[in-house]
Amino acid sequence: MIDVKHLSKSFGEVEVLKDINETIDKGEKVVIVGPSGSGKSTFLRCLNLMEKPTSGDIFFEGENITQANEHEMNKLRQRMGMVFQHFNLFPHLTIKKNITLAPVKLGLMTADEADKKAEELLERVGLPDKADEYPSRLSGGQKQRIAIARSLAMNPEVMLFDEPTSALDLSLIHI
């Protein structure tokens, strides 16, 4: 599903990733562990092309995506969900609207279908009563679960999580 070959990423003189090779098969769960600043987030951002690798290639389902144009990158990101370390929820939208916005705007679902999906996902992450709240009214752990629900609403083929449990209560990590 994902094949990384000789991936390197530098920011100026600082080489953050050096000659990374990894194959991730469909259904496989991979955990990247390392100290703060070791390049874990940069690696994830390279996988979904939010960061352009300095060198190397990334293949997604056999297709080299490294040189994708803007349109191709946007299509790829629809297939590859990402939950960010800092959640990136829209503060001026309700929780339900945060979850339904992208699937409706991209034409993947009708508004009614997206609402139903949002309700199912809110139930799944244990926050069915938060649909009409705004992000500022939620705890860090609740925001993180909403970010997970929002990403799942796109029905991605692959999920990338950047520090997925950093704000979660230990009793909720099984979700």
Where are these regions (language model features)?
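ABC family nucleotide-binding domain
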Residues: M1-I173
